[in-house]
């Protein structure tokens, strides 16, 4: 079984784990996942080559997005942001299977905002 990984260069796993944010349409058919990588290995000075996409690879195969943007601070690359979009429930379910495998492979958790009216704050804070 192949370990779930993200690659900016085919065959080279990106070691930096991104922050991932999901948005979906009200009908649930379309949506996108935004990946933000802070100081990824793919933009290290010693890395050669152009980044032409982000591949999400697991035991089912691969998904790819070409929507990649670099973030720069004082003229130096500091982050990468990639957006993966889906246009069907099947595509979303496939993405979520990858996300679950990727989370397990990297010791990550998953949290979901159940109520858009929630306010930020610590629910366990003492008065």
Swiss-Prot record:
Polar residues composition-biased segments: 109-118
Compartment(s) of residence: Cellular thylakoid membrane
Main location, first listed in the record: membrane
Location of the region described as Disordered in the Swiss-Prot/TrEMBL record: 107-127
Entry keyword Disulfide bond: no
Keywords: Membrane, Photosynthesis, Photosystem II, Thylakoid
Record family assignment: Belongs to the Psb28 family.
Annotated protein name in UniProt: Photosystem II reaction center Psb28 protein
Chain's gene name: psb28
